[in-house]
Structure formats: C-alpha cells, structure tokens
Amino acid sequence: MKPQQPQPPLLLLLLLPLLLTTVSSYPLNPKQLKALQSLNISTPTNDPCNNNNNQSSSSSITCDDASPYRHITSISFTNCSSTLSLPSKTLKPLSKSLISLSFTNCPSLSPPYHLPISLHSFSAVSSFLQNNRTKLSGLFLARLKNLKTLYISSTPIQTSRRLYVILGNMHKLTSLTISNSNLTGLIPKSFHSNLRYIDLSNNSLKGSIRISITRLKNLKSLNLSHNSLSGQIPNKIKSLTFLKNLSLASNKLSGTIPNSLSSISELTHLDLSMNQLNGTVPSFFSEMKNLKHLNLADNSFHGVLPFNESFIKNLNFFEIGRNSELCYNKTVLSSNLKLEGLAPCDKYGFPLWSPSQKEESLSGENDYDVEGGNEEKTENLKTKEEEEEEHKGSNKTLFGLGIGLFSLVFLILFLFYLAKRCRLI
C-alpha cells in the first residue's frame, strides 16, 4: 500500500512558518538603514526592526512587511544621549513611511523641526528641556495636521498662540494630551468632533469651561484638573453621554453641581475636589450604577450627606472631607466606614463639631470612628452656640446672687435702724 500523501491544506500549514520567516527576512530599505546608522542606534542584529526586545537599547523600532524592502513605521527614543541629534538629512529618508515618533526623557535633544507631516502619532515626555532654543514650538506642532494621537507631558510648549491655533488643522485627532506644559489662555471655542480623549491638566488655563467641550458627543475622558478655571460647571455637560472619566479638580469652579450630570450614566470616575463648589451634595450620585471613584473633598458643601452605606461601600474610592458645613447622619451610616474629615450631624442637621474641635478630637483618629468611648466623647462635645448659652446662663446666676446678697444686707441694715429708733422712743 502506498503511503497517504499530505492534503494540500495540511501542506500549507506546514509551510506557513517558513513563509512567515521569508517575509520577515526582507531587508530594511538601504537609505533608511543608513539614516539609522548615522544616529548611532545600536541594534543586536543587522536587522534594526528586531530590536524591540533589547532592553539595553535606547530606541525601539517598528517596521512594515513590505517587499523587496521593509520600511520603518515607528521610532521610540528613551533616555537619549546628550549627543543625539536629528538633522533634516537623517529624517528625510524616513518621512515617507514614518507614522509614529515618541521621545521619553530626552531633555537635551532639540525638537525634530523637519518631521514629516504624515505622522499619525507624536509623543514627548520630559523632553526638549535644556533651553529656549530646544523647547517644543506650538507652531511646529500645528504643522502635524494628520495626527490622530498627540501626547505631550512634562514638556514645555513655547508659544504665544492660543491652543486652538495648535489644534486647528488636526481634523483627525482622537486623543489629545498636553499636560504640565505651561499652557496658558482660554479653552478653545471649538474642537474637532473626532476627539475621544482630552487631558489638559496641570497647566495655567483660565476662564470658564466652554460649551465647545459639551459638543464632543463621542468624548470618553476629560481631564482639566490643576488649572485656574472659574465659573460654573455647564448644564450642557449632560450631552457627553459616553463620558467615563471626568476630572475638574484643583480649579476655582463655583456654584452647585448641576443636576444634568446625572444624565451621564456611563460615568465611572468623577473628581471635583479642591474647588469652591457649594450647595448640598446631590443625591442622584447614589443612582449612578457605574460610578466607582467619587471625590468631592475640599469644597464648601453644606447639609447632610445623602448617601447610604451600600452606595459608599460599592465605590472603590470615596473622599468627601474638609467641607466644614457638611455632616453625616450616624444613624444611617455605619461606624465601620472611614470618612476622613467629616463630622456627624446634630439633631438639627448641622455639624456636631466646630473646626477647632474637629482638629483636637480627630488627632490620630478617623472622623467616622464614633463607637464606644469615642461616641461618649462625641456626645460630650458642644458647639460654640451651646457654650455661649452656658456662659450666658452662668452670668445670669451670678447676677441674681449679687442682687440677693445686696438685698439681704440692705434688709439687715434696715432692721438694725428700726430697732435703734424704737429704743430711742
């Protein structure tokens, strides 16, 4: 009997690894290889496209699978040498294929001003820091009109132009991060509708939260924290129905939390801490089933905290402290919860502790730990009004005693006088 011949599909499967090896063995474009060699980029083999797993390398390179030559599509520089430079003659051979370029911890490097405008992704973290000549230019960024991702962090942007001028031509941009980059001015009056992620935190932006942001129907994350934004949270924020993360912390926002915020049912992370927000804490938060992170600390909220124990326990993070006029109902919330910087309410719904008493009574303890001996201390604490009433009462008592003693002395003297007159008669 003749041995059975392998079926064609099985034969193809057996040959597939060989075919893949053949494809990946195509050499790098000679001009691009020469450009890399001029940058002194060390590679473990003759193929720079295979250095991604080399931890000792200061660069990471990605290539396509084109034939007869492969092309570089992505370069990431990390911990750059002070001697590294990117002259235009080096970048020019890369311009036709390079779509992603990133720099991390390259402080002495000058920005690559001759970058190809075909880039889809540009990232700079703690780079271009040495002097004004090497700082990143807003005008340079504005040229990159094909970007889909722009990530700038801890890298100053030198520009007298407004943020909109930088972003104006980036119609394809979906992810925008410019954080800790010395941005000033106002939030742009308009954004391109493709944006899904915005992080403009740790800058010096001022003015109000513009309505332009609420028109970004596909926005999933918005971080405007650590700026100098003022005014109120706009009611139209309810339009951001796909928003999952919202951070407006460390600004100068005032007014109340708008009820329209309850319309963002997908919200999982909300940080409004360190502002000047006032009014009562909305009860609708407890109905937002996806909410896992809630920070309302360091504001001017007042009244009774409207949350129950099950809602707070369902959160991964909850901070509400340092709202001096806000308190919790200890008959609703268990003492097992740890609420830092929040006083219990008295029977009238006001904080039981004054701020000075809070500091004394909370030294080394949690604000919510009021069981046992702590509960007895809590009951013995008096508000300023109670102390004033006691002080007034003691003054009245002393005054009454004084009048009584004076009357007694007068009566004795009067009787003595009458007795003396009777003897004379």
Swiss-Prot record:
Start and end residues of each stretch annotated as Disordered: 355-389
Extracellular topological domain: 26-397
Signal peptide start-end: 1-25
Transmembrane residue ranges: 398-418
Residue ranges annotated as Cytoplasmic topological domain: 419-425
Biased composition (Basic and acidic residues): 374-389
Cellular-component GO terms for this entry: plasma membrane
Compartments (UniProt record): Cell membrane
Function, in words: Involved in plant defense.
Annotated protein name in UniProt: Receptor-like protein 55
